[in-house]
Amino acid sequence: MTITPEIKQRVTQLRQQLQKANYAYYVLDDPIMEDAVYDQLYRELDSLEKEHPQLITPDSPTQRVGDQPASQFVSVTHNIPLYSLENAFNLEELKAWEKRWQRSYEKEEFTSVEYVCELKIDGSALALTYENGLFVRGVTRGDGTTGEEITQNVRTIRSIPLKLNIDNPPPIVEVRGEAFLPLDEFDRINQEREEKGDALFANPRNAAAGTLRQLDPKIVDQRRLQFFAYTLHLEEAEISSQWESLNYLENSGFLVNPHRKLCQFLDEVEAYFKQWETARKDLPYMTDGVVVKINNYSLQKALGFTQKFPRWAIALKYPAEEAPTLVKNIVVNVGRTGAVTPMAVMEPVHLAGTTVQKATLHNSDRIAQLDIRVGDTVIIRKAGEIIPEVVRVLKELRPPNTQPYEMPDRCPECDSPLIRPSGEAVIRCMNLSCEAILRGSLVHWASRDALDIRGLGEKIVVLLIENGLVNSIADLYYLTPETIANLERMGSKSADNLIKAIEGSKQQPFSRVLYGLGIRYVGSVTANLLVENFPSIDQLSQASFASLSSVYGVGEEIAQSIIDWFSIEKNCDLIKQLKKVGLQLETTSSEQITVEPSLTPFSGKTFVITGTLPTLTRNEAKALIEQAGGKVTGSVSKKTDYLLVGEKAGSKLTQAEKLGINQLSEADLLRLLNSE
């Protein structure tokens, strides 16, 4: 059919009118067109494009929702990595962050520093790419280096422009931001799911993440996600600050959080945080803190990055939420190291955006300290809005005839005697054949930071064990699609994918294999340090206590743990089996592992420990600190950076207070370690 100039002009007019209406409605929240008029114009444009498909452009409003579902998502490497942010859980930690960056870069031109404050939106981070002003790619954050391309789904988000609203756009524009579900939309979706008998989403963040990974973009479109842009990357652009970037994004057609603020001093940042700590309850979306960034790009560049975080930004998290609930039962779980951890099973309670039914009680000492009993009303808290814990018992509400809880003396999984090793706060099952230990070891082996075997979660691990298919980590590598296809929830396609993932894990580097073995105290950072100094499993297994403990960041506790692990015959047999099936148990020429001491969390920091800690022994705390690059001494002095304080602290606490030394609780220590 012939395309007349009048038709071309009409299509262009319709497209421009609809784009303006979309921007006014979804970004400015100021509608300029009645719904009926919008629908009429949309139908006219859609009809003209169907009659003349050569007139369709990628930025047309009709092209937001694709017709065909995706078969799968493809992993892609980010052009620019998406870093995590360091967390601060109180204003003192915010001040400490400022002192850290000031110490690391002292130059006159940055004596006056501005900070940009933005609400930290509780959603899913996305990376967007525009070429010559047109949206071409949307990718999930993933692990920060690689993510999944979900371009079709991202196109459905109306607050993301398909074409930048600027003249002469740069050839490449990279935008970062957060996709989220408004609270009213979250409630609507859950109401519909409840009516259909589907499982409810726990919180808006989970709902947003699950929505973005839908294969059918029509489902994504129905859920009405929103997007706040917060980072801009341009090549050779004359933009010198974060504040200018946010304005550029807004002028380009993006929705930028309207509550951002440019602060001249840290006192203003604190006031902003306190304001939104209260006012956030009135927002139409979830926010879990405030992101604070140094405004000046030159200073940002000078400060640079750690392994995981930009030094020029920090996330100041809101205080943990607390709520009362009833303890229905106390159960114990056996972990992969044999540690037996008591858990409180409670009446469901809504806390920090999720429904909580269980909370850790850590160990028998903590239970005795709390005097917690079945039937008690307790206050629970989500530290950092992640880990539920019982903080106190409301004994005035305790019903009569409750009994003190006693920890079991035999393993609930294998009935072996439980032992409390000398100097430890936890009791352990020492039976290496215990099914719970095997289950935990397999799940750890398959985890993202270890061998990263996709599809091998706890449910599949349980099925493999129950069906007698796996009795050790090495057994995974003898599985075939035929042997697992008949397992519950499996099927031939899933079986093929799982076996491919297991086979693919043979290419994971030695450092990941070492971490996956689950040697006590050997985290991913320590595994890298060990591999750098002992490039093969044979060298590591034969290393002396002196050579191990002399490695920076290892220390005596970790060294002894490694020696103990290799002294067990069953573990040595496992290494032989892993060699046989082809795992990487030595470094290759292409594998370069460098872990700078300056990049470890507590590098150069001196700690002193005083009092009795709630869950850790002094040796355990010391090992964790040393593993993170710190040093533990026996006395407080001006050179002490932190005092780790437990109950019944002695004169060291008094001395630290006189010297103005920072004090940490065990919870503070663990939060700092986890945030790294």
Swiss-Prot record:
Residue span, BRCT domain: 597-676
Protein name as it appears in the record: DNA ligase
Biological-process GO terms, alphabetical: DNA repair; DNA replication
Catalytic residue positions: K120
Native source organism of the sequence: Crocosphaera subtropica (strain ATCC 51142 / BH68)
Statement: the UniProt record of this protein carries the keyword DNA damage: yes
Alphabetical UniProt keywords: DNA damage, DNA repair, DNA replication, Ligase, Magnesium, Manganese, Metal-binding, NAD, Zinc
Binding site residues for Zn(2+): C411, C414, C429, C434
